[in-house]
Amino acid sequence: MPVRFSKVLIPQPKSKFIKTRCPDCGNEQITFSHAAMVVRCLVCGRVLAIPTGGKAKLAGHVVKVLE
């Protein structure tokens, strides 16, 4: 009887880097999806991401999810 090999699952992280656009000035910058600190726009200073203990609440527009 042949031995069956089970497929080994490799765990993938659920967090990603996200390219966000500031709604005020249009600046695009890369933020972390599970940010632990308040993320502000580097140009105008508007808050783009607020930490919630898990995934950050995004106040800017998501342009692209980087993998």
Curated annotation (Swiss-Prot):
One of its GO terms (cellular component) is cytosolic small ribosomal subunit. Zn(2+) binds at residues 22, 25, 41, 44. Keywords: Metal-binding, Ribonucleoprotein, Ribosomal protein, Zinc, Zinc-finger. Belongs to the eukaryotic ribosomal protein eS27 family. The keyword Kinase does not apply. InterPro entries: Ribosomal_eS27 (IPR000592), Ribosomal_eS27_Zn-bd_dom_sf (IPR023407), Ribosomal_zn-bd (IPR011332). This is Small ribosomal subunit protein eS27. The keyword Zinc-finger applies. One of its GO terms (biological process) is translation. NCBIfam families: PRK00415.1. PANTHER family: 40S RIBOSOMAL PROTEIN S27 (PTHR11594). GO terms for molecular function: RNA binding; structural constituent of ribosome; zinc ion binding. Its cofactor is Zn(2+). Part of the 30S ribosomal subunit. Signal peptide: none annotated. A zinc finger (C4-type) spans 22-44. Pfam families: Ribosomal_S27e. Coiled coil: none annotated. Binds 1 zinc ion per subunit.
